[in-house]
């Protein structure tokens, strides 16, 4: 399983809006993607730091996942104070 982890920076006062956009726009879009297996958004409203984690059942469709990422970032680009940092990891253990 592949995990896409995105480190986000926003203004602390925009945390609730980021959560709204992620919940109402990003997650429904993700559910339409092939091999999507879950999404989590972690936030620190005091600092404006956010971490998005999405899980994918396979790496076969990496190009599609990259396209999804670009579309996802567009949904909340106006809230960002820095360019998001994206990394991919292999998910080795689920407990």
Located regions from the model:
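Short S/T/G/P-rich N-terminal loop/turn motif that feeds into the first structured element of a domain
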Residues: 1-51, 55-70, 78-95
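Glycine/threonine-rich phosphate-binding loop and adjacent beta-strand/alpha-helix elements that clamp
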Residues: 73
């Amino acid at each position: 399983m592949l995990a896409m982890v995105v480190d986000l920076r926003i203004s602390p006062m925009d945390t609730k809006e980021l959560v709204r956009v992620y919940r109402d726009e990003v997650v429904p879009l993700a559910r339409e993607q092939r091999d999507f297996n879950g999404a989590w958004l972690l936030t620190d409203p005091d600092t404006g730091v956010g971490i998005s984690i999405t899980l994918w059942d396979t790496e076969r469709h990496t190009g599609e996942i990259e396209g999804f990422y670009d579309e996802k970032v567009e949904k909340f680009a106006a809230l960002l104070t820095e360019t998001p940092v994206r990394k991919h990891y292999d998910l080795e253990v689920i407990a």
